Structures are given as C-alpha cells and as structure tokens.
Amino acid sequence: MLTATYRLQVHKDFPLARVREIVPYLNALGISHLYLSPLLAARPGSTHGYDVVDPTRLNPEVGTEDELRALAAELHDAGMGLILDIVPNHMGIGPENPFWENVLTHGRQSRYARWFDIDWDAHPKRRGKVVLPALGDELAAVLDKGELRLDISESGGVRLKYYDDTYPLDPATVPPELQLVQFDPGAKQAAEEWVRGEEGKARLRALLDRQHYVLAFWRCAPSDINYRRFFDVNDLAGLRMADPAVFDETHAKVLEWVSDEIIDGLRIDHVDGLRDPLGYLVRLRAEVQR
C-alpha cells in the first residue's frame, strides 16, 4: 500500500548506484515507495530527464538495466516499492533524437512521422515541411552573413550547421560534390569550396529548399511553427499518443519494466497536454494490468 513517497531526481551526478546507497535510510524514515524522475534516455547532461530523446532504452547516464533491477530488488526486499515518472506528451528534439532526425531526413515518408504532432499542410508554400524556428534572423540575412554552412564529420557525413546546431540532409538531395566526401576525406576542401561566394550561397539555399524542413527566424514561431510543443518550448515536440502504434512503440520499455515487476507504479507528467487524456489513461491502465 502506498502511504509515503520520497522523490529523487536521477541524473549523471546522482545515478541509480547512488540511489541504492540511501535505501536503508529511506526505509528507516518509513517511506513506502521511492519515486524517481524519468529514467528513459534523455538529452546528454540532462539534470531532470523530462527531455526524453529515446523512449526505447534506459538513460545510460543514470546506470544500467542490471543496476535498475538491483535497486528494485533492494527496495522490494525492504518492503518498499518503486514509482516512475513518464512523459508521454512530448520528446526532446535535436540530433540526439534519432526518431526526430529520421523525420527531418525523410519527411512525412519517415516511419516515425506518425509519432509527432505535425501539421504537414499548415502552410501551402511549405506543404510537407517541418518549420524549425531556429535562426537568429531571416534566412536571407543568415546566408548573407555566412552563418549557415556545411558540417563535415571525420567519417564523411555531411549536415547543415548553424552555430552549435546541426541538421540532417535527405540523401537524395545531396549533390555529387558532397557525396564524394563520404568516400574520400580529401574531397572535404572541394566540398567547402562548393558553398563559398555568391554561387555557393545560391547552391546552399537550393540545397536547403529541397529538405523536409524549413529553417525560420525564431520570432516567427508563434505564427509559423507547425508542430505541437510543450507550451512554447521549441525543442520539446508533442507526441501523438492517440495513435495506438505510437503508444505501443513509445511505451514498450516502460511496460517491460512493469511486467518484470521492477516498477510498481507510474506518475504521468503533463497528461493534460494530450489530445485524449482519459483515453490515454484507460489504455495505460489496461496495459499495466495485463
């Protein structure tokens, strides 16, 4: 029976191994259930875990599956339970999120496009594109100042780069001059020349126009953004939990922990942000009680 919880924020500086150390103390306090912040893979360095980027695995910064199982076993041996916070409403987006990256790369044809609450037809001139309000100025000004460039990795991968942010390219749109870099590191200089000068700027603009996303001035977010966010936080994108397939794919790991009797209870963060909160809770309860 749940009578008293004690909440802990788990992160790289306070991982599961450290949590285990205080189980005897919590037991002596009379705590019935330990309540943990989200444990699914979040952005590297996240101190809270609510910016999940991969719901299919445990956050490697907080520990291993064996350490989670050991913590649950120690709690259960002490007559205590484990409650976990989960975040079905949104995910952190960016290069760390392989599902979002796949959507930016392949557009609405991506198998993960159904995960995200994107209105692909919101703008007639931008139909089929995700609007990313990430620029500090209008795109033309950004190009004029040379702030948008190519990012060529040591392995030969090519992305668009805007200061610290990078964006994927649809492989079908990458011209031969840039494709060569993947096979010949010596072609890097030629690739860099490809974007120099006025002609290079025009080529870069044409390349960007062929992507499944639009880089826009951040001030345009309120009127132009076409994906649901967590309030007005641009890098937390809403998920389509009313879609049964999305529910299944994003909850498989958590439900595995429940089925294996590692997790004894779930707390749902921001459930009111979902399209159908009641429907979600009914579905979740049914899955948990299987």
State where each predicted segment sits.
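Acidic/aromatic-lined carbohydrate-recognition and catalytic surfaces
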Residues: 1-228, 260, 267-290
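N- or domain-start disorder-to-order transition segments that initiate the globular core
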Residues: 229, 239-243
